[in-house]
């Protein structure tokens, strides 16, 4: 996130978070909370986002606040969710979700209802949510910014699935990348550099197109994937989102810009490149209107159950 575009609201939020930080850092993901939706596995990955050499000495934000590496960049946790009805196949499809600033894994899963929405989509895929910068104003994606970062993490996810007897064998299939706010940086760099970029079929950004529009445009031009971004005026991403429009026109990439109140499931299925303006708060854009669920429902992922006639 460009520091010059950071709204004061987010800075105030960061100060409040720092006041309760000691309590939040002790929070643990409660896996049995989601038993009704499937199986949630929380594991420490060797190939997690962090620790990473660019944050070994921590992170200083705007030359004022310092975020210590032991507190904010040492958590190797990765949540792997297997929905009820999942059927193992030769190639395992993944949906990877990256969180934004000032967050931690349990809060991400609970507040944004990721597991509930993912399970309701009835797609035959695995949800992977890695811990990013923990309770820090930082868009760095750690190892996922490296060419083999995504491949290593998903390969390790396959090992976790095998150890838990979810699958007997399998390789990495199609991939959907999604994320909120500061996740834009990690997703953009994976589209540009990842060894798995040919397998990335779709991208969902929730109020996060703050910069690197050129990388998203280049990916759309080269790989013709599906790209949907939901943006608001609340998170300071409106102008930077609309700055991508002329880039798409220059590459002769057709796109649709619409209002959330007007968009239908048919629109989501039909439009390959879609910008959706949503007049809702920045921090509610993922879950308030079940947009994550609707995007998954209309995705190219196979269903885990036969759709009702």
Predicted regions and their residues:
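Bacterial N-terminal signal peptides that target proteins for export
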Residues: 3-15
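Active-site machinery of serine-nucleophile hydrolases
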Residues: 91-94, 98-158
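Primarily recognizes the serine-hydrolase "nucleophile elbow" in alpha/beta-hydrolase
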Residues: 173-216, 221-222
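C-terminal catalytic histidine-bearing segment of alpha/beta-hydrolase fold enzymes
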Residues: 230-309
